[in-house]
Amino acid sequence: MKMAIAIQCHTNSEQINRLINYFQDDYIDIYIHVDKKSNIISELDIKKNVYLIENRVDVKWGQFSQVDATLNIFKEIRNSDYKYKYIHLISGQDYPIKSLKAFKEYFLYQNSEFIE
């Protein structure tokens, strides 16, 4: 079961690198949208399962630009070579509270969508 992790971020490259390292798995790809105003890309630990969104948006908090950034991530995921069973959208400030094994196992046995 292949999953995609979509991350929107603008700061704190150390935290983004922690997320990248946490989600290292053959069945997980990571798509990262870095705010156009940000200069943290050169500090990110890009691995084989990490894809940077090229069409970056100048995101303004609470404005439609956040939706634009999200849509750009989803477009890139849709245009990839994989058909993912799940796509998880998280902020660069988030961090999972369960182990990667528990995270994967939870979704492995689900047979539903979480958005109607």
Question: What kind of feature is each model-predicted range?
Answer:
Residues 1-116:
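ER/Golgi luminal nucleotide-sugar-dependent glycosyltransferases, focusing on the catalytic module
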